[in-house]
Amino acid sequence: MRFFLMFVVNALALTSVFVHPVGASDGKKLERVVLEIRPRVLTPNQGDNKTGRLSLMGIYSDGSSNKIPSTQVGFSSKTKTASGNVQVVSLKGDKVFPVEGGIATIEASLARDGKTFTASTDIIVAPYYRDYSQTLVLKLFLAMEGEPVERLVNDPTFRKGHEVFCSFEEALEVIRKTDNLTRGIPKIIYLVGWQKGGHDHGYPAWSEVNPRLKRKQDATALDSLRWLIREGRKFNTTVSLHINMVDAYQLSPLWDEYVANDCFAKDESGKLLVGGIQVKGEDMYNVVYPKEWEAGLAQRRINALIKMIPELKEGHTIHIDVFIANRDGGKPVSPWHLKPENGGLTPDKYVETQRKVFHYWRDRGFDVTGEGTGWAHPPGEHFIGLQPMSWWYSWNPMEIPECLGARGRTDRGSDGDFRFGSSMHGEEIWKQDKDNMPGFLGMFCRTTLPWYYLGRSQRVKFENDALFYSDGVVARNESGKRIIRKGDFILREDDDLFVPALWNKKEIIAYSKPGYADKSWKLPDDWRKVKAVDLYRITLEGCVPLKKRVPVSDGKLLLSLAKEEAVSILPAGAKLSGKK
């Protein structure tokens, strides 16, 4: 596993409650105290976990324990990790209230018998509308007009026909097939190139939908896009948009207004700075976030997009690509605006504006996911508590739990470190062949499937190259094989997978990359009463019945799989979930 550098910051904000000392009870000697909090993760924008409750347990010399009244305990909190060192929680007695996203450490202090006993624990505030640790996040490339520059000629994106790679109507078919292959797992798909001109065109404007993508029966391309978002829901898929807040092009309808408001990057002499080029004849420029925000233009284009496509709000998510605060090597986006006399806009000033952008979207019901963190921002800035998911994972997984910062892929050339898990992108597979999706099912089973399962448990410790999770789950190499187990229940043995599909009622997905014959798999504990199972082959067109009432003997299933085959396993007679 390649770990990415992350600096943990400590906040100064503290809250406390007065300690009331008490005497010993029943002659027992207090030896230590343990602080507990329930729930451990606060999700103020999801479900019921909006506040937490603290309890301090006293452990006595005779081995007994009891809960110590909160009125006798002093509680204090401090931020452990959060973007901008913000206060993460506030306390009122033994109750914990979320303030901002991040991780806080809560300490309890008890005075007894002339001694002070202390204990601490961490609490996580994930202020997101969606749980990205339990969602497959993908991108679907739709279109890009123009002739690519030489360095991009061989990219699959620019093969013949890239002006319209996938129409809105074709996109629904991709979504349907993907839902079949993934057995209905919750999904988010961000559309790339949905705007006029396709990918990397028209920015900073988001006001016109690509007319080339329109369905014949619709009056406008906007109607078709809104139709796709609504239809995608039928296949367990939230359709949203891939947007960009830093790039700009001269053909944009907003070009003159942004120039007039001094919102584009300039070189040291004050001339507009070309930030790059993707398509011949169309130079790319960059937006200066603080200037755009100050002029109210960022807020205006965000509001306009939400108003134009109201269906987006139900999905509660948007993806901002290339959300950078500096160029490679820490170079400023705009050398001209870096000068004190022109605003002194350092990368830190860009980050301050980016935080405002995150909050502005959130206040309107949206999470903002991104391409990455840390790679084009000041050292240590990972938008912890602001960005719920990174397309390319860049947090320290032992410090940032998946519910606070979830991953797309972790490695460009492989499936990533199996011990921590990795999800998938899908985009590169669809670019090659969106109709047949070769390799999609295998990658899903090797990456997202076990990652989703592991996301239900807490990473406890990484020791001797073994990762220990809560609930007894362990991921490590055993006798040269990559193993994920929970006791004697094996979920993974190299590229043979046997993993509960926890998003469905009772289902296991088995997959093998090399294939095998007559391999014995122990069923999980909650299947102990199952005496026979039905097998279904997973295909693009749905699940195909394979075998009925396969016997389970002594809690074990004997299974044979062909190379790259995946099957769905259900208790015999159980109804198969999902759509065709």
PLM features: residue spans?
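Positively charged n-region of N-terminal signal peptides that target proteins for export
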Residues: M1-F4
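Extracytoplasmic soluble-region selector
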Residues: S25-P127
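Loop/turn elements at helix/coil->beta-strand transitions in domains of secreted/extracellular proteins
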Residues: S133-Q134, L181-I188, R233-S240, L312-I318, ...
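Aromatic- and glycine-enriched glycan-recognition loops and surfaces
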Residues: L152-N261, D348-K356
